[in-house]
Amino acid sequence: DMEDALNSYINSINKIDYLFMVAAVSDYVIKEPSINKIKRNKESLDIEFTHAPDLIKAISSRTDATIIGFALETENGEYNAKQKMKDKDLDYIVLNYANEDNAGFETNTNHVIIFSKDGAKKELTLDRKDRISAKLINYIINNK
């Protein structure tokens, strides 16, 4: 459950120096979950969703740790990533594009751009994901 996850994170954040939040647990949750099985007796089913708690936003205001978020975008990437960094009070945001060849999902390679709240920008060109991860961690630790 989302509230349990939030409480668990909050209870442990004061013990860390860096927090890499690589993906949202869920952006939306079912507004009124059914406690019973939903039978197939209609042609269609409408389910209403509501915003899930924003874990990274809740955490960023309660820790001195360096918080790194990620933004997967398809358009207006730089603007959206910087806005997300500001809105969620992050120290860094890592932008990658879902619609870029050989990057994003279902590939062993990626290309990312790192933005910091102090205005720095660092591009990590297309490389294997394990190398991108190592370069990302090294950059963050050496630029704190």
Description of each model-found segment:
Residues 1-72, 76-144:
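A cross-family phosphate/adenosyl-ligand binding-site feature
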